[in-house]
Design a protein with these regions (language model features):
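Active-site Gly/Thr loop motif
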Residues: 211, 264-325
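Structural helix-adjacent loops and short alpha-helical linkers that scaffold large soluble proteins
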Residues: 54, 124-129, 187-200, 247-256
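Active-site helix/loop module of the DD-peptidase/beta-lactamase fold
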Residues: 104, 123-163, 193-227, 231, ...
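Active-site SXXK
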Residues: 59, 82, 89-90, 101-129, ...
């Protein structure tokens, strides 16, 4: 009888020990989930808690994505207070992704081109955004159209040039890849360099971005200004942090602060007049110089953000009020979801930063 009691007690002790181990493991897993490794690429690293972020919410989000319950994303990178705090990758069946994987940004490229225009203005390569762009192409004077002569670089930057339309430039927004390609052509005329070379010398090198690809136009062989840039997710985050810092990286002014402020401020509405009820809605509703501006709602808190956006839910989101940058990359769309990455932002990332 005594031996039986001793055996039962031993089983109880073993069970309690296992529960303790499992609890400790779960706690450790939650605290370590998504914490980046130091790649010696210019990023300081810490846990989410050290930067006042709730790691449990971030891990819940990450696990939901891994289990196929949430949006289809390839990676999420979160930076707060200039420190990389969360980084998680989700390999797909035919696509391996990790911290070294280059990811095409599609139209996020446009926002990088805007930074190049700011650098060109600062260096005196471009003197005036309101000069008609035909002045950059005197060799094509015979192709000028009287109704399009007033188009300026400012019109192109705000997607209001109305190329291929009889509408007056500068009045309303109409998204166009062609307008950003023209911005790239103006940059090449003004600087003598294509956007990829200009970016490497004046933007990527100072940021310590070394692994870069840039898709070329199949006919001209020139780098695509509208949607050709391919970077690591961590490097897309550097672009976001540069903007959050008003053009400064590691104490050096790379892009003029005045340009960053102006280019990420509302220059034109992307929608018509909004009702009082509509104003409460989430998502992008205005445009700067190749940057989107929008908002999210975290319970009663309205959070304004700036974003570079690309096809298939590519987003680099800058949240000044929370001193935070969030990068999403994806290679396939999420079913029945219009903006899956914004859903993740609203349900998990913003609440994680609530305190």
């Amino acid at each position: 009888m005594q031996a039986r009691i001793s055996f039962i007690a031993s089983l109880g002790f073993l069970a309690l020990s296992l529960i303790g181990v499992q609890t400790a493991f779960a706690t450790e897993a939650a605290s370590n989930c998504g914490i980046p490794s130091d790649a010696h690429d210019g990023w300081a690293i810490s846990s989410p808690e050290e930067q006042a972020l709730n790691s449990t919410l971030l891990c819940t989000m990450g696990d939901g994505i891994s289990e196929g319950k949430l949006a289809n994303v390839d990676d999420i990178v979160v930076v707060r207070h200039g420190v990389l705090v969360y980084e998680r990758y989700y390999p797909q069946k035919q696509l391996h992704t990790d911290a070294t994987t280059l990811h095409r940004g599609y139209s996020m490229t446009k926002s990088v081109v805007s930074l190049l225009v700011g650098i060109a203005v600062d260096r005196g390569w471009i003197n005036d955004l309101d000069v008609p762009i035909v002045s950059y192409f005197p060799e094509n004077a015979d192709l000028r159209m009287p109704d399009k002569a007033p188009i300026t670089l400012r019109h192109l930057l705000t997607m209001s040039a109305k190329l291929g339309s009889s509408e007056t430039p500068g009045v309303s927004f109409a998204y166009s890849n062609g307008e950003t390609e023209l911005v790239g052509a103006v940059l090449q005329k003004a600087t003598g360099k294509t956007v990829d070379v200009l970016a490497q010398e004046n933007l990527f090198a100072p940021l310590g971005i070394t692994d870069v690809e840039w898709l070329k136009d199949p006919f001209s062989g020139i780098a695509q200004s509208a949607r050709g840039l391919i970077l690591r997710p961590r490097d897309w985050a550097k672009i976001g942090q540069l903007v959050l810092n008003r053009g400064v990286w590691e104490g050096k002014q790379i892009v003029p602060a005045s340009w960053v402020v102006k280019s990420t401020a509302e220059q034109i509405k992307t929608e018509g007049p909004r009702s009082a009820e509509h104003i409460k809605a989430e998502g992008p509703d205005s445009y700067g110089y190749q940057w989107w501006l929008g908002r999210s709602l975290d319970k009663d808190r309205r959070v304004e953000w700036i974003a570079a956006m690309g096809f298939n839910s590519q987003k680099t989101i800058i949240i000044p009020a929370l001193d935070m940058v969030v990068v999403f990359n994806a290679s396939r769309q999420s079913k029945n979801m219009v903006a899956p990455e914004l859903d993740l932002l609203d349900r998990y990332i913003l609440p994680a930063a609530r305190n």
